[in-house]
Amino acid sequence: MLTRKQHDLLLFIHNRLSVSGISPSFEEMKLALDLKSKSGIHRLIKALEERGFIRRLPNRARALEVIRLPEDKTEIQKKISRDYTPPKADNDVIEIPLHGRIAAGLPIEALEGQSHLAVPPSYLGSGAHYALEVAGDSMVDAGIFDGDYIIVRQTDEAHEGEIVVALIDNSDATLKYFHREGRMVRLDPANRAYAPMRYDASRIGIQGRLVGLLRRY
């Protein structure tokens, strides 16, 4: 029998593979399960392998294959989203607000326009969520590409090293790794072609943290 965290991770991997065909990164899995470190993800992956639910594909980075799912898959999906129930769309997906585009490069004007994006229920944990379309290439080394859709859990707090939606001077939004340096905030890209950005903490507002990603082909 799987633990709750093992169930949650298995379904997160399964739904990511079903939607995009790409395994989530360890960072994405850590954020989705709200764990403090990637070591916890490594332990969960190992446990799922040992129980015959997943296997690693040799000679391929970030390559996981789901071999089987637990019989109580439906019940677990209900538990994952029990604290937040947005309006449902067809085909077992949930619609969340799509707030325009977010810069993965230089900051751009924040959160213009709104429509909706349909996502699998297992992408969403507790709390309110929204989606943004990525513009730019500054986060490519984190597996986030121009045109991707990111799933964001709405929060005004950020932990060290998380990927966040940061609002600069209440006008420009950007997607970056979050770091504190005393009274300053450093926003790091995941592309060596871009330099880190540093601001006084009073100029930065956290709009949410990354919990998932969708890619359309």
From Swiss-Prot:
Gene Ontology biological-process annotations: DNA repair; DNA replication; negative regulation of DNA-templated transcription; proteolysis; SOS response
Q: What is its EC number?
A: 3.4.21.88
Positions annotated as active site in the UniProt record? S138, K176
- Residue ranges flagged as DNA-binding region: 26-46
Answer yes or no on keyword Metal-binding.
no
Q: Which UniProt keywords apply?
A: Autocatalytic cleavage, DNA damage, DNA repair, DNA replication, DNA-binding, Hydrolase, Repressor, SOS response, Transcription, Transcription regulation
Q: Where is this site: Cleavage?
A: A104, G105
Keyword field contains Transcription? yes
Record's subunit section: Homodimer.
Q: What does this protein do?
A: Represses a number of genes involved in the response to DNA damage (SOS response), including recA and lexA. In the presence of single-stranded DNA, RecA interacts with LexA causing an autocatalytic cleavage which disrupts the DNA-binding part of LexA, leading to derepression of the SOS regulon and eventually DNA repair.
Family of this protein: Belongs to the peptidase S24 family.
What is the name attached to this protein's record? LexA repressor
